[in-house]
Design a protein with these regions (language model features):
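Interfacial transmembrane-helix boundary/kink motif in multi-pass membrane proteins
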Residues: 11, 15, 42-60, 86-89
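Cytosolic, membrane-interface loops and tails of multi-pass inner-membrane proteins
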Residues: 33-49, 107-128, 183-207
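Glycine/small-residue-rich hydrophobic helix-like segments
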Residues: 127-177
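Aromatic-anchored, glycine/proline-accented short structural segments
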Residues: 86-145
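Conserved small/polar residues in nucleotide/adenosyl-binding loops
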Residues: 208-213, 217
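Core segments of transmembrane alpha-helices
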Residues: 58-73, 135-147
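Helix-coil boundary and interhelical linker segments in multi-pass alpha-helical membrane proteins
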Residues: 1-18, 69-91, 148-161
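Transmembrane alpha-helical segments that form the membrane-embedded catalytic/substrate-channel core
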Residues: 21-37, 67, 93-112, 165-186
């Protein structure tokens, strides 16, 4: 809506708009395919039993959309007619890096689930051998890129939104919902497996290591 309210959108406005659309479309298709195949989203199994917990998750998702896209929306609506500069290209590089990491890690996880039983086996190959949550690493990097692209179109206090957006994504995924939930589920399923204990001890939560973990599948 913000983009189509403009009379003469700049190149940066168009890039921000298209990147948000691509991100939302890709994520929507991915989640639909996963839930359609599994019949549920196990992350919310326990929460659905308690109304206020489930409401909290939905409120968190709504806040996530607003805060993560905040910098992009303000940049699109900004009267500053910014041109593509070096900082914008840095942001574009970060966005594509994060997007590709997220897409590849989601694909690797999906292929693993098609050939393995996730209730007894865990993925530790590919990008998942370098990070326990490479998809979240990609998501955070993607939004850092969006914030950097937005900088050229922001001014004054608006710069704060460029910082708030990726910081909010980080805390939501790493401290509040994503990682804590998935780590708890993984610990319950595989906590007694020595291979899982070794994997968790030697593989960072987000940041990649220079050497991948053992490429042999751990079960």
């Amino acid at each position: 809506i913000a983009y189509f309210s403009l009379d003469n959108p700049t190149t940066i406005d168009t890039i921000l708009y298209l990147y948000v659309i691509v991100w939302a479309g890709r994520l929507g298709i991915f989640l639909f395919r996963r839930i359609n195949k599994d019949g549920k989203d196990e992350r919310f199994d326990k929460a659905k039993k308690k109304f206020f917990w489930f409401l909290q998750y939905w409120m968190g998702q709504a806040a996530w959309v607003v805060f993560t896209a905040g910098a992009s929306i303000l940049a699109i609506l900004s009267p500053v007619e910014a041109e593509l500069e070096v900082i914008a290209f840095i942001g574009i590089f970060l966005w594509w890096s994060g997007f590709l990491i997220e897409v590849i890690s989601d694909y690797q996880k999906r292929k693993f689930r098609e050939t393995s039983d996730p209730k007894t086996e865990f993925i530790s190959t590919g990008l998942w051998g370098r990070s326990r949550h490479p998809n979240y690493f990609g998501e955070i990097t993607l939004w850092v890129g969006m914030a950097v692209i937005s900088l050229s179109s922001l001014s004054g206090v608006e710069y704060v939104t460029a910082i708030v957006s990726p910081v909010f994504v980080y805390f939501l995924l790493v401290k509040l919902e994503g990682v804590p939930m998935l780590e708890r589920i993984a610990d319950e399923r595989y906590g007694e497996l020595s291979d899982y204990q070794e994997y968790k001890a030697n593989t960072p939560c987000l940041l990649y290591t220079s050497d991948a973990a053992d490429d042999e599948e751990r079960v």
